[in-house]
């Protein structure tokens, strides 16, 4: 299917780019430009909780509690505020503020009107004015921004009196501004840095622009898609940053994989035509990109099981962005490849040798067309034929396959997995133990809600809010509330007496207003946020009189019940994403063992990542260096980072193991397939991880703690996943499993084959080296008869030892029809029965005097990648060697 799409893209290469760009621009102009007006600040709480019900009852009866929307603090620099000559000017300023903004301000309660003692600090230096805004929900933030300029000007109007702005709405506005700056920072700093990295990796200006085109279109298109979603469901403002982060990073990664595979196909076999290269690149890398995006989308869709609208909006937006990135990669890029052809390597840039890790990645990815031409010239110089130099066996084994001018067997991405396989047991134990050790800090994790501590310590709004909480603890903007319904005076007294015994409060509960329609609201402050859970639990234990209902409400209760809802749904989310990814990977790999291995390794990496995040953001390691205040984590953000990490980990697993499956489809041994996959994708995965880390790094300097949390979580996960897990742990574990890696029941292989995978029915059969047991479809060893050795021929006179060029028919290409027919002729001429014990891999090798031994593959039961070498001197098989190594020996004899 994907190959046919590549053919379609080639045939319509001039139309597809124009259509795609036109659709993206139209989407942005029609919807994307209105996104800021459609975003919401709400959606953090569980809509089905008692605290949400309490808030709804209070708002319906008394109106929204808007007293803490905006707080203006006035502090006298010398003396008391009453003695300040600016006292009257402040009173006049507040009166004019209310008169100038009747549509935004409901009322103002201040010390400067009636000089209420509760509205001034104990030292008499600081007094405040509470500004209640008229709007509800998202309109509240718009009302605040309408008066924001006039509030900021107050600091310059009263000499000798400092003015600060605090309050819940002011904090929300500061958080929103910080997220907008994060997006601008990512676009301003991350994109140029990514462009430079792509230029180093590809060595070509044109090739480096391809992923950037996909990334840019993905950002623009995702804004339009988010705006469309906001018309149907609530989309939190935080979703914008997450969608930009994921959409940009994955779009560039997918573009990197597509460009790398197209250049590889373009230079395969001495150079293919552009049409074939586009078709094969789309049929291989394009298919992998789509399935990889499906893995990420499945992981993110697990967020939909939670009741919070914030998580749902992030899931919708992120899934849309990831899907758009994949669609652009398999539509826009194949068409551009078709237009460019070999010009994709135009404007080559000389890469210095001191470029470090990126240089290693670049050399592993090859030098494109230039390297391919150099390889062709070298082959012609040695007198090799084109068909011989680029045989299927050579392409199936990293020992001889070459991407550009550097053989894969000489790259770091071949040597490191090879070393890990040689020390498989020790590597597995060390890495698993280390990852489990890093996960230990998870036991110290703490959860909380969003507040001013998510802002930088130097932020003016955060400083003002801290001052207000310190000077006026009984007026905290997040009080705990009791909403009592259907209670008479005696019953209300019973509830009040029980509430007065609760510990951890700043004072006794007081009614916010007179009882109305049988509903009374009591309010009190909590001494410390760390006591929220204890206070809520004590209030839940209140036994109301018969017929009376007591709801525990307020911000602390909303946070506690939101956390409880998350942990109630977390097992369901985990079961769903694990099961869904197992099914998808089984269809991609044609195996059940590989998906199970991938899930276990992903969970190990996730545990280590969350452990490091807890160590950093809860325990405070690096807090001064990165400019944040350690404290409880916001539970929805923790669930979000878990889904993102799981999706990214399975994303890279698909890219890595897909190349191993390709080698296995060509009947390569297990160890050879492992080296083939890691050697071909190690550099690409590392380059993709570096690029993703650069994008995340731009968000790592965010002013918002929760964006830092997500960014550092992705950075840690990428470092673990692209290095020790994919390059060391995966090869080691797969080497230990050997042919059991490929086991699956017949129906799984049939389903994988229906999706275009060439999964052979005997792929589970023993074809590899080492200690693995060969298994067929049913899981039982599949036995094949081995023919008797041919009787020795008559002795021939010894010829001088000199190289003799073998006839063309003596060295057939692996799996060729000629070799099968010649072997069948030899087998039919033998009269002896084949009753010896079967072996996993067999060849018929005949000594022919002074000519090199002739080797013929046995059809269907023989792996072309590995053979036993027959020694004419001892008359028995010696060690197993790769088929391509035998070809290299023959080449040296020529």
Model-predicted segments: where are they?
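Juxtamembrane interface helices immediately C-terminal to a transmembrane segment
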Residues: 42-43, 54
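Short hinge/gating elements
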Residues: 38-42, 450-451
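Intrinsically disordered, compositionally biased tail regions
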Residues: 847-894
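Asparagine/serine/threonine-enriched low-complexity, disordered tracts
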Residues: 830-831, 835-836, 850
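Membrane-embedded transmembrane helical bundles of large multi-pass transporters/channels
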Residues: 1-38, 135-447, 557-826, 840, ...
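Structured non-transmembrane domains adjacent to transmembrane bundles in polytopic membrane proteins
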Residues: 48-67, 78-169, 442-625, 632, ...
């Amino acid at each position: 299917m994907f190959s046919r799409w590549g053919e379609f893209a080639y045939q319509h290469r001039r139309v597809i780019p124009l259509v795609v760009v036109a659709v993206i621009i139209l989407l942005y102009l029609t919807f994307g430009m209105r996104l800021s007006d459609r975003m919401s600040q709400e959606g953090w709480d569980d809509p089905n909780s008692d605290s949400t019900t309490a808030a709804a009852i209070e708002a319906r009866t008394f109106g929204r509690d808007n007293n803490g929307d905006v707080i203006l603090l006035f502090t006298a620099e010398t003396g008391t505020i009453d003695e300040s000559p600016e006292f009257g000017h402040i009173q006049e300023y507040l009166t004019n503020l209310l008169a100038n903004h009747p549509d935004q301000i409901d009322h103002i309660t201040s010390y400067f009107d009636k000089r209420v003692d509760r509205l001034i600090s104990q030292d008499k230096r600081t007094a405040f004015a509470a500004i209640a805004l008229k709007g509800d929900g998202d309109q509240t933030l718009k009302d605040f921004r309408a008066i924001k300029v006039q509030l900021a000007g107050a600091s310059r109007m009263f000499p000798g009196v400092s003015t600060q702005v605090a309050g819940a709405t002011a904090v929300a506005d500061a958080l929103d501004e910080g997220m907008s700056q994060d997006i601008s920072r990512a676009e301003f700093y991350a994109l140029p840095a990514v462009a430079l990295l792509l230029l180093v990796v590809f060595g070509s200006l044109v090739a480096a622009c391809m992923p950037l085109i996909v990334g840019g279109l993905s950002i623009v298109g995702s804004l339009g898609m988010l705006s469309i979603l906001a018309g149907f469901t609530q989309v939190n403002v935080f979703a914008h940053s997450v969608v930009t982060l994921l959409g940009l990073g994955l779009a560039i990664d997918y573009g990197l994989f597509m460009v790398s595979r197209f250049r590889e196909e373009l230079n395969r076999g001495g150079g293919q035509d552009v049409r074939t290269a586009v078709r094969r690149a789309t049929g291989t890398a394009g298919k992998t990109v789509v399935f990889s995006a499906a893995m990420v989308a499945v992981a993110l869709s697990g967020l939909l099981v939670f009741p919070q609208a914030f998580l749902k909006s992030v899931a919708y937006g992120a899934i849309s962005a990831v899907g758009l990135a994949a669609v652009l990669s398999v539509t826009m890029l194949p068409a551009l490849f078709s237009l460019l052809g070999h010009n994709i390597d135009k404007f080559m840039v000389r890469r210095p040798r001191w470029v470090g890790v990126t240089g290693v990645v670049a050399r592993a990815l090859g030098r494109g067309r230039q390297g391919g031409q150099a390889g062709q010239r070298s082959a012609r110089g040695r007198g090799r034929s084109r068909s011989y130099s680029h045989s299927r066996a050579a392409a199936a084994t990293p020992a001889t396959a070459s991407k550009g001018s550097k053989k894969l067997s000489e790259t770091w991405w071949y040597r490191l997995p090879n070393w890990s396989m040689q020390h498989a047991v020790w590597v597995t134990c060390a890495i698993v133990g280390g990852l489990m050790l890093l996960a230990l800090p998870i036991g110290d994790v703490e959860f909380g809600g969003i507040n001013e501590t998510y802002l930088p310590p130097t932020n003016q709004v955060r400083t003002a809010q801290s001052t207000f909480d310190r000077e006026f603890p009984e007026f905290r903007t997040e009080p705990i509330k009791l909403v009592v319904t259907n209670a008479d005076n005696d019953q209300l007294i019973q509830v009040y007496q029980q509430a007065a015994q609760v510990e951890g409060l700043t004072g006794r509960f007081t009614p916010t207003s007179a009882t109305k329609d049988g509903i009374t609201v009591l309010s009190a402050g909590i001494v410390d946020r760390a006591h929220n859970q204890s206070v809520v639990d004590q209030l839940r234990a209140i036994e109301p009189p018969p017929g009376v209902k007591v709801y525990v409400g307020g911000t602390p209760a909303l946070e506690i019940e939101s956390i409880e809802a998350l942990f109630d749904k977390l097992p369901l989310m985990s079961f769903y994403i694990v099961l869904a990814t197992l099914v998808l990977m089984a269809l991609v790999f044609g195996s059940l063992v590989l998906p199970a291995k991938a899930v276990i390794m992903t969970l190990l990496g996730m545990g280590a990542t969350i452990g490091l995040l807890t160590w950093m953001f809860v325990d405070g390691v690096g807090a001064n260096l990165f400019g944040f205040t350690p404290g409880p984590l916001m539970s929805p953000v923790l669930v979000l980072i878990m889904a993102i990490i799981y999706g990214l980990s399975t994303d890279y697993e698909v890219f890595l193991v897909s190349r191993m499956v390709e080698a296995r489809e060509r009947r390569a041994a297990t160890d050879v397939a492992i080296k083939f996959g890691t050697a071909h994708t190690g550099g690409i995965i590392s380059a993709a991880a570096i690029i993703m880390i650069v994008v995340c790094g731009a968000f790592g300097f965010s002013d918002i703690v929760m964006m830092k949390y997500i960014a550092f979580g992705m950075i840690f996960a990428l470092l673990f996943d692209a290095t020790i897990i994919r390059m060391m742990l995966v090869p080691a574990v797969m080497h230990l499993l050997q042919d059991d890696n490929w086991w699956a029941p017949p129906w799984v292989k049939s389903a994988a084959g229906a999706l275009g995978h060439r999964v052979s029915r005997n792929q589970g059969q023993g074809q590899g080296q080492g200690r693995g047991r060969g298994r067929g479809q049913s899981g039982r060893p599949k036995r094949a008869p081995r023919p008797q050795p041919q009787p020795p021929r008559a002795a021939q006179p010894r010829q001088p030892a000199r190289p003799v060029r073998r006839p063309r028919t003596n060295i057939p290409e692996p799996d060729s029809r000629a070799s099968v027919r010649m072997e069948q002729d030899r087998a039919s001429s033998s009269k002896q029965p084949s009753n010896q014990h079967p072996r996993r891999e067999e060849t018929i090798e005949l000594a022919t005097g002074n000519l090199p031994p002739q080797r013929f593959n046995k059809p269907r039961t023989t792996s072309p990648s590995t053979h036993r070498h027959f020694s004419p001197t001892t008359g028995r098989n010696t060690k197993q060697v790769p088929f391509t190594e035998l070809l290299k020996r023959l080449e040296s004899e020529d």
